[in-house]
Structures are given as C-alpha cells and as structure tokens.
C-alpha cells in the first residue's frame, strides 16, 4: 500500500479528531440526561458475558451449549400435552433453589402438584406460588417479582392459560380476536428490559395448537401471538418418545418415558441440538441415567458386555445396577459429572460469550479487512477534494 501524502495525513487526523470530539460530547449529553451507564462502548461493560444457571439436566445443559439457561433472558418451553414441559421447568426451579436462589411459580393452570414438585427436589416451603384469576393479574405479579430484583427464576405455567379479563367477564361464545396476543405483546415489551436488568430467568411454558386449513408445512403453532417467539432467547420443543418398561416384577409396567428436548432457538449458542432424557413417573428426569449414558459414550465409564466400570472398578452389571451405584455414591456421581462437563467445556454457573453470527476464527481477519477498506475510501475522498 502506497504511503499517504503528508497533507493527506494531517487532514485525516483533523477529520478524525473532530468526529471523536463530537462523539464524546454526544455521549456526555446522553449520560447527563439518562444517567451514567445509559450508553457505553461494549468493551467498557463490566459484564460482557452471559451468566448461566444449570437446567438441572446434564443432557439439556450440553444441548443448550452454554451449560444452562442464560440469566436475564426469556425461555419458552412448549410441546404436546403430557410431554414433560412442567417437569423440565420444575427441575430448573429445584436447581435455582439448590444454588441459593429464590424461585416463583405462576400457576395459571391451577394444576401444580406439590408432592410431585417435592419429589423433583423443589423446596415447596420456600417456593413462591401464585394462582392468578386472570392473565393480566398473573403477568402483573410476575412483573413485580422481576422488578424487585430479589427473584432468580420466575416460571409461568402456562401462556395458554393466561386468559384476558375481558374474556373471563364475557360470555362463552363471545369473540375476542387477538386479545391474548395483544396482552402478551404488551407484557413482553414491559418485562423484557426488566428481566435483563435484574438477571432474572423467566420461563414461559406454552401449549400447542393447530392452524386450520394448512395443507403444506407444519400446522402446529403456539398460542399467545408471536411476541414471545421474538423475545425468547431460548425455545425448547419437548416431545415424549417411547415408554420405558420396568424391571423384575414391573417388566410389563410403564415406569417412565423417553423424552426428546430440541433447542429450536438459541441466541447464546448454536441452536437445533437435541437432548434425550428419561423422565421417570413420580421422580422426574433420571440424572443417573443420563450421566451413565453420556459418560459411557465419552468412554469415561467403561462398558464391557453388560458390565460398567469406572477407574478399573466395576460399578454394576446392567444399566439399572450401574444407576443404583451412582445414586448410592454421590461423590462418584459428582466426580464423573465434572469430567463430562469439562469435556464439553461446561461448568456450573460459568459465563459464556454471546454467539456471533460468523466463525470466531475469522473475526480478526475480517475486522482488519473492514478497517483497511474504510481507510482507503476515506483517503480516496480526501484526494478528490484536494485535486478539486
């Protein structure tokens, strides 16, 4: 690249200095009007990374790519009936309490089973529960809890059950076109900034509906309009697969079901990953089962025939005996869990960078190319002005 004339360099410096001064004056004026921290360079932010909280499931943490749910973000969990949506959300509640946080459950469906929640590890004595009379009331309660900054997790079960007051006060058969969608759109606009500011995780459980007259494509949709789809940083599609049979005397009895959780949207890691978990009836996600499977695939736990072994020590013949061993030896469970997470670069409560649209390896080269292009364009313009 040819060296710039001396006069051209002086003009460039003067031009750049004036722009920098104008920018600094504008930043000072914005901070004066709206307060310190209202605008800043991204590199000056104290928190450039997104903190995460474990979902309570190792397989789901891996599928999420970041090690859990991002704090200060909206999560949507949807799927067919009895697919395990509430179970997935309750595991998040139990995990939040385990980490010393406070969780709230907005039960719009009025269907929460305290005994089942306790079986999943939820401390029901500490859980904040609200069963609102209308959708507006439920969202207002959620908003006040989030604004307080004292709640770490808010679960709304479910969006479909958030019935607008006008619909409740009206008669059955009255038309209320778009009423719930407008309510959710307004709620998302109000809650979005507050959720991010307080670092609260907001989980919205949603149901499925079918579009009438769809001949091609997926006819499934979720109620409540499109606002939640846009504002959600993570969307999980939960689907029940095959039934799990028991062993011994229960070999003909269904004791659980294999459930597939697909990450259909993810703003902090690559999307479209899947997690397959075993949801045992009355117990929730089998943590020993998912750890045994993943650790075996990574060869952390060795499998020879029907025997499972760890560090040359046999831990059980058959998967059920190996699961039982892991459940009875929590120190071994935690040790293997840490090894698995380290393999995937996941640590509980870690911070992860925002996912960029381009490959990170190419970023420095692209940035240099952009800077060089801008400099050349500026120089060409200045040379033309001098010639004139």
UniProtKB/Swiss-Prot annotation:
Instruction: Kindly give the PANTHER family that the UniProt entry links to this protein.
Output: MITOCHONDRIAL DNA REPAIR PROTEIN RECA HOMOLOG-RELATED (PTHR45900:SF1), RECA (PTHR45900)
InterPro entries assigned: AAA+_ATPase, DNA_recomb/repair_RecA, DNA_recomb/repair_RecA_CS, P-loop_NTPase, RecA-like_C, RecA-like_N, RecA_ATP-bd, RecA_C_sf
Q: Which UniProt keywords apply?
A: ATP-binding, Cytoplasm, DNA damage, DNA recombination, DNA repair, DNA-binding, Nucleotide-binding, SOS response
Question: What is an example of a Pfam family matching this protein?
Answer: RecA
Role played? Can catalyze the hydrolysis of ATP in the presence of single-stranded DNA, the ATP-dependent uptake of single-stranded DNA by duplex DNA, and the ATP-dependent hybridization of homologous single-stranded DNAs. It interacts with LexA causing its activation and leading to its autocatalytic cleavage.
Q: Per the record, where are the segments of Basic and acidic residues compositional bias?
A: 357-369
Subcellular location(s) per record: Cytoplasm
Read off the SMART domains from this record. AAA
Q: GO BP, one example?
A: DNA repair
What is the superkingdom listed in this entry's lineage? Bacteria
Q: Among the entry's GO cellular component annotations, what is one?
A: cytosol
Q: What is this protein called?
A: Protein RecA
Q: Where does this protein hold ATP?
A: 79-86
GO MF term list: ATP binding; ATP hydrolysis activity; ATP-dependent DNA damage sensor activity; damaged DNA binding; single-stranded DNA binding
**Where this protein primarily resides, as one coarse class?**
cytoplasm
| UniProt cross-references to Gene3D superfamilies, sorted A to Z | P-loop containing nucleotide triphosphate hydrolases
Determine if Secreted is one of this entry's keywords: no
Task: Give the family, as the similarity comment puts it.
Answer: Belongs to the RecA family.
Region: Disordered, residue numbers: 347-372
